[in-house]
Curated annotation (Swiss-Prot):
Membrane-spanning ranges: none
List of residues binding 5-phospho-alpha-D-ribose 1-diphosphate: 26, 72-73, 98-99, 102, 104, 124-132
UniProt lineage: Bacteria, Pseudomonadati, Pseudomonadota, Gammaproteobacteria, Lysobacterales
Record's keyword terms, sorted: Glycosyltransferase, Magnesium, Pyrimidine biosynthesis, Transferase
Entries under Pfam families matching the protein: Pribosyltran
NCBIfam families xref list: pyrE (TIGR00336)
Record carries keyword Endoplasmic reticulum: no
Name of the protein in question: Orotate phosphoribosyltransferase
Entry's family note: Belongs to the purine/pyrimidine phosphoribosyltransferase family. PyrE subfamily.
Record InterPro entries: OPRT (IPR023031), Or_phspho_trans_dom (IPR004467), PRibTrfase_dom (IPR000836), PRTase-like (IPR029057)
């Protein structure tokens, strides 16, 4: 497992953003783990998280020249990532959307750098149903931008349903025709748990969950 994946998972565990136990998801599934990016709730935690994102993006070789953060969690993530890249000598333009359009001031739903003609990388925490990402794709295209990729913190790599064996990330990637990458995925989480004495007890529930809900590419 590459270093940024291990660093991210340890950071998430330390921040209590990654928890193990029994959690009922919005889908109704009973999951042995839960990820909440909202627990990266300080400058230091967010800065470290952004470095993990940047390492994952660079490792994937994504081609982009603007960062876009969908409201709401994508906004601080994209902002922190822009700061991380500035520290690496790359000053990237940044934009995000608001949920409700304004009819005063600058107006509209978009804030930040113009999207027209830009290769836009969408930055978010997870892809659950894909609704927010699809909205972001539509907003970017309507503004003349060209979506070039999507990056999230954690890919759960689980099927949408028994009828659709793809994950939400796989479905979005196929629909949009762009790469979707994650800092870490369920396969990485399994490897991380196996190498952590405090988490070995969760290995069996994780494997059972992957067996029931994992995509064919989970590994």
């Amino acid at each position: 497992m590459t270093d940024h994946r291990t660093r991210f998972l340890q950071l998430a565990l330390d921040a209590d953003a990654l928890r193990f136990g029994e959690f009922t998801l919005k889908s109704g599934r009973l999951s042995p783990y839960f990820f909440n990016a909202g627990r990266f709730d300080s400058g230091a935690k967010t800065a470290q998280l952004a470095q993990c994102y940047a390492d994952a993006i660079d490792a994937a070789g994504l081609d982009f020249d603007l960062l876009f953060g969908p409201a709401y969690k994508g906004i601080p993530l994209a902002t922190a990532l822009a700061c991380a890249y500035a520290g690496r000598g790359r000053d990237l333009p940044l934009a995000f959307n608001r949920k409700e359009a304004k009819d005063h001031g600058e107006g509209g739903t978009l804030i930040g750098a113009p999207l027209a003609g830009r290769k836009v990388l969408i930055v978010d925490d997870v892809i659950t149903a894909g609704t927010a990402i699809r909205e972001a794709l539509a907003i970017i295209r309507a503004a003349g931008g060209m979506p070039s990729g999507i990056v999230v913190a954690l890919d759960r790599q689980e099927i949408a349903s028994d009828q659709d064996r793809r994950s939400a990330a796989q479905a979005v990637a196929a629909e949009a025709g762009i790469p979707v990458i994650a800092v870490a995925n369920l396969g990485d989480l399994l490897a991380f748990a196996a190498g952590n004495a405090d988490l070995v007890g969760f290995q069996e529930p994780l494997l059972a969950y992957r067996g029931r809900y994992g995509t064919d590419t989970t590994g």
